Amino acid sequence: MKKLSKLRLPLIERELSVLNEEELRAYIGGQKQSCVFNCFDYLDGNLHSANDYYNWTKQGLGYEPDEHGNVDISDVGTIGGYGGFNVSKVNSGESFILRSDGQTSNGERVMAVFAVGSESNEEGHAVVISGFYRTDDERIVYYYYDPTSLCSGSILSDDCDSLYLVKHENPNT
């Protein structure tokens, strides 16, 4: 194999185009990630990308996720609306019927936000509920899919900080 001499490297560098940070992000989708963006991307069947939700949030709400990917929890409905979702927060004491396929009786999907990390440094994390079961002592455990880490898990309903009912305005898209 031929070895490149150091003299050729400057020539190669001159010939290669250099992208600035904004061009690079647009080209490879390098925007800051957020579990909320990833959940909506997953729920819309890849109609829009997580990068689309990032761009809409930055343009419409004027901010980016923080270094941990967190967005303002009060903006979850607005962010989902950018992608054509009706999003409603489930209030304390409010109930809904969740079928075994993870949808409500009205065809909505459920997005849960729960705390992760140590008590002194908790961050929120959003996942999509995919089902549930009741324990022997009548506690509800949700199965979830995490589009950010591409894994599944389970969590007690009591450990969820917020639940959102999510339905796409045009389910045929």
Language-model segments: what does each one mean?
Residues 15-17, 23-25, 43, 110, ...:
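Intrinsically disordered, low-complexity regions of eukaryotic proteins
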Residues 44-48, 53-172:
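Conserved active-site-adjacent core of cysteine acyl-enzyme catalytic domains
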Residues 31-34, 70-71:
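Soluble non-cytosolic domains of exported or imported proteins
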Residues 1-30, 85:
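N-terminal secretory leader/proregion of peptide precursors and effectors
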Residues 22, 34, 124:
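Short, well-structured alpha-helical interface segments that form or flank functional binding sites
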